[in-house]
Amino acid sequence: MQRYITVKNPACYDLDPYIGKYAEYTSIDEPDKPFAYAGHIERDSRGEAMVHDSGEDWVYAYTGVINEIKIYM
């Protein structure tokens, strides 16, 4: 069984301890959609934590658009 934590409406500092971890998340635009988006938590060029989507290289999800996130340990 994989361990994970769930955070609702995360701020970038909530993601800081998990840089490099795999995560699944829901968008604030689609709160009823299951965890359909996934990627790894990284830092952008300004040092802000975000999720780099694994399905699309150019998609970055910043904390302002994440409704809920599961971070796998």
Summary of predicted features, one role per range:
Residues 1-17:
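Mixed-charge, Lys/Arg-rich low-complexity intrinsically disordered regions
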Residues 4, 67-73:
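Mixed-charge, Lys/Arg-enriched low-complexity segments
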Residues 15-66:
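Acidic, low-complexity, intrinsically disordered interaction modules
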